[in-house]
Amino acid sequence: LEAWRYCVTAHRHVMLTMESHEYFDMGYVADLKSALLTNFNKEILCLRIGGNDLLSCLNLRRPKDCTIYDTPIGLLIPQLVGHFVPAGFQLSSPVFEHYSNTPLLKKELALDKVNGLLTKTAIHPSQLNIIHDAYKVNSIDYYEAQMIMDANAKSVFKSNGSMLEPATHRNWAQHILTRAQIYGVIESHLQFAEHPSKIVLCTRQK
């Protein structure tokens, strides 16, 4: 990696693709994380998970009726997230090659977000708007994230039937606000209840 470091000039970013058999070895993954932090700490735009090539390492291809999380790669993705996201890297989820199956793509996108992935690689132009819309932030999450990040927020407070704790949820809130900045927020009609920390939202998609 040191040799590659000198090829990356100022104001340029790189996106590495994790797609070879070494990524099934968590020792290798830990070593790579350390090397990236040392050599490319500020230049890494994103780490892309190459799902199809990782499946190929196992002599597999994704079935047409399965999300990536229904395959062995579904066990690998949380491990990669657990190594890289706490270190400050963002991950891109694998492509969904069965581009005509929109409902299954949307299901996979929902699971991508649950697993902490910030974006998804598109394999076909018809997927771009679907991916972008899926990563828009729900208004409830957006406003709760704002409340959590408020410097005057209480240590624990309630909102929309949930308990929020800034000390615990701050990283989540920052992730939500980052997504909102990139993808936008689903339009909402706001109605504040008697307590300002309780927000009732009716969301509607554009």
Can you name each region flagged by the protein language model?
Residues 1-206:
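Expand to "…catalyze enediolate/carbanion chemistry for C-C bond making/breaking, isomerization
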